[in-house]
C-alpha cells in the first residue's frame, strides 16, 4: 500500500461503527430532499476574470437557505457519540442536475473560543450514502454554501453563483475548469536536498489525525477584496481552511484549526496594516513579527498571511519552528478564484518540507525547478507542481488536488519527524490498514494475460 488516501477512507467510515446498516441510521435521521431546486433558466457558466468552465457543463440550483440552516443545526459533532449513531442526512446537487445523498457531521475549523464569537460560520464533514466513496467538506456562512467533495469521478465544487447572492449556487466538476490566470508564481527558495540516510518514510498517516493550530492573517488589501470587514474576512478564511482540510485530511491525515484570537490578525486598512502589500519577501518577516506579537509564539503551530500579491512564498520546513513558523504568504489578484486553495495548499506544503515536483524550465517554471524532486514532466499536475503556470511547458491548466508520492513522503516526514512532530496535537481515529487476501502464490509463464481477484 503506497497511498494513504485509501486508508483514510476507513477512518471516515468510523462514523458508522456499531450500526448494522445505513437503513438503521436513516430511520432516526431527517432528510433534505427539498433543499435544492434546479434552475434551468440560468446559465451555469459565468465568465470571470481568470476562470472558465467547459461549455455546457455544470448546473445552477436555488437553495432553501433557511431549511438548510435548520437541518445542519442538528448535525452531531464528529467525535461525539451521535456522530456514529445518527449523522445528518444531506442531499448534494450534482453537475448533471441530479442529486446524491451524504452523511454530515459538524467539524469545526476554529478553536472553541473563536467559534463562540462567530457562530454563523459553520463547517461540516461529508461521507457518501449513495456513493460510499464520496468524502468532502461543506461550509455554511453568510456568503452561502461552499462544498468540495471527491467521488469516483474526481472533485466536485459547489459555490454561490458569482454576483447572484447566497441563494443561487453552481455546481461543477473541477475537471471542467479549463483556464487559469497563468502568471501565479511560487518564489520559495529550494536549498539542495541532503543525501538520504536510507530506508523509507512512513507508508501512511496511520490511525492518527494530526491537528495544527493555524494563525491566518489578512492584509488590508485582501480584506478589502472580501467584504472589507473583519466578519466578512473571517467568513472567507473559514471557507478557505475548510477546503484546505478537505485536501490535507484525505491526503496526509492533517487538519488545520484557526487559533482562538485569529480575528486579531485580520486588518481592514491597507494604509495602516503592518504589511508591505506588494512585496512577498517583506511580507514573510512582517508576518512573523505580527503573529508573534498578537497571538503569542506559544499559541500557534504555523502562521500564514493572505495577500493580493500574485504569488506565494514560504520558509521550507518552517512549521513548529520558533522564529520562522509564520514566514509564509499566498496571494492572488482574482480574490474569488476557486483555484486559490490550490496555491495555499502548495505553500503550506512547503512549510511541511515538500519541494517542487515539476521538471519544466519555461515560463514561471524557469528558476524554480528543484532538481532533487523534479519527477513530473513539464509543468506537472499535482499540488506541488506548477500546472498552468509554465507557458510552453504546461501539461494542463489547473492542479489535480492530490500530492505526488514524493510530496506525500516529504510532508509525512515533516509531520511525523522534524519539524512537525514538535507541535500540534493528535486525535486517534481508530483507523487500521486493510488486510487483503489474494489467494495462494501462482506461477504463470511470462507474457501470459491474467486477471487478479482479491478480497478484504
Feature-to-residue mapping (PLM):
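Positively charged n-region of N-terminal signal peptides that target proteins for export
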Residues: 1-5
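A residue-level detector for conformationally permissive "hinge/kink" positions
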Residues: 10-12, 89, 98-99, 118, ...
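Extracellular (secreted or membrane-anchored) zinc-dependent metallopeptidases
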Residues: 204-456
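Positively charged, low-complexity intrinsically disordered regions
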Residues: 6, 38, 171, 328-330
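Bacterial N-terminal signal peptides
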Residues: 7-18
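Zymogen propeptides/activation segments of proteases
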Residues: 19-281, 429, 454
